[in-house]
Amino acid sequence: MLTHKIIGLDVGSKTVGVAVSDLMGWTAQGLDTLRINEEENELGITKLAEIIKKEDADTVVIGLPKNMNNSIGFRGEASLKYKEELLKILPDINVVMWDERLSTMAAERSLLEADVSRSKRKKVIDKMAAVFILQGYLDSLQ
């Protein structure tokens, strides 16, 4: 059993999918999708900090997209920048960077298998990818 919940993030250029663990550390549930604007440096960190406090989380797992050759590309750099910005607001939070290769594709596949419409998929894909990222991390703790 965890002493605090864990938050999972799928950071994109326009949205951040947010997931939260249960206190047992067994399951991840989709929580929210934050609208952001990387170009304007509007990253939704203040709203995320509110969620972290409300959920009483002490750890944030951020998906780190890597290339298949294990190098970190543009999106990976953006996730690392997001981590830095989060730590400016919440310096005491534990941040784990988690290899998220193929998490969005897996989320998309499971939504397709569930016959979710295209418009609905667009609304939930980032939150679902955050669930896949966080669930992978939780499974590694078992």
Curated annotation (Swiss-Prot):
Any one GO molecular function term: nuclease activity
GO biological process: rRNA 5'-end processing
Chief subcellular location: cytoplasm
Residue ranges that the Swiss-Prot or TrEMBL entry lists as coiled coil: none
E.C. code: 3.1.-.-
Keywords: Cytoplasm, Hydrolase, Nuclease, Ribosome biogenesis
Signal peptide start and end residues: none
GO annotations of cellular component type: cytosol
Protein purpose: Could be a nuclease involved in processing of the 5'-end of pre-16S rRNA.
Alphabetized CDD domains for the sequence: YqgF
Record-linked NCBIfam families: RNAse_H_YqgF
This protein's name: Putative pre-16S rRNA nuclease
Family from the record: Belongs to the YqgF nuclease family.
Matches recorded under InterPro entries: RNaseH-like_sf, YqgF, YqgF/RNaseH-like_dom, YqgF/RNaseH-like_dom_sf
Source organism per UniProt: Staphylococcus carnosus (strain TM300)
One matching Pfam family: RuvX
Compartments, record wording: Cytoplasm
Top-level lineage group: Bacteria
The organism's taxonomic lineage, starting at the top: Bacteria, Bacillati, Bacillota, Bacilli, Bacillales
